[in-house]
Regions:
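Long, charged, mostly alpha-helical binding arms that flank functional sites
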Residues: 1-69
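Basic, alpha-helical terminal appendages of large translation-related enzymes
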Residues: 43-156
Length: 156
């Protein structure tokens, strides 16, 4: 969004199928978490995130040279990102809070389950902005929201 949307959120709404997928994975996660099945709850989010990443890759590539299509791809991706960030927050709070911070949202609002099914525009409205006026925080190149555990770092 730094260059495509001038540092604000996409003004287009996510596609209906994206909103439905966000709702479906949120309900599945909640059912599994309620049954203390953390493994399958997180697996559901992982599968959703992989599908969203694939959708973003295909849509952003297809939208090259078409600003409206690219903004639509961003709108779909941001809606999915918000859902993944909300659902992964219990497992990886610090990384998810960095995502929230860079999206420019108040964490109490962003992680409030009363807003779990809100669109990006509805979250903006709850914070007193609109997608067109809601500024995001720029990212340096190759920024990683999630720190690696020492066991994940290769020893030379």
């Amino acid at each position: 969004t730094q260059s495509a949307c001038a540092g604000h959120l996409p003004t287009l709404a996510a596609h209906d199928d994206v909103m439905a997928a966000c709702r479906e994975v949120t309900l599945r996660f909640e059912r599994l978490a309620h049954g203390f099945d953390a493994h399958n709850a997180l697996a559901a989010v992982d599968a959703f995130a992989r599908a969203a990443n694939k959708r973003w890759g295909e849509a952003s590539k297809a939208a090259q040279g078409d600003d409206v299509a690219y903004e639509q791809a961003l709108a779909d991706a941001f809606q999915a990102l918000r859902t993944v960030t909300l659902l992964m927050h219990p497992a990886t709070p610090s990384g998810c809070e960095k995502v929230c911070e860079h999206l420019g949202f108040d964490s109490n609002l962003f992680f409030d389950w009363e807003h779990a099914f809100d669109s990006i525009a509805q979250l903006c409205q709850a914070q007193g902005t609109t997608p067109a006026t809601h500024q995001t925080v720029g990212l340096p190149p190759r920024f990683d929201f999630f720190e690696r555990h020492p066991s994940q770092i290769r020893q030379k």
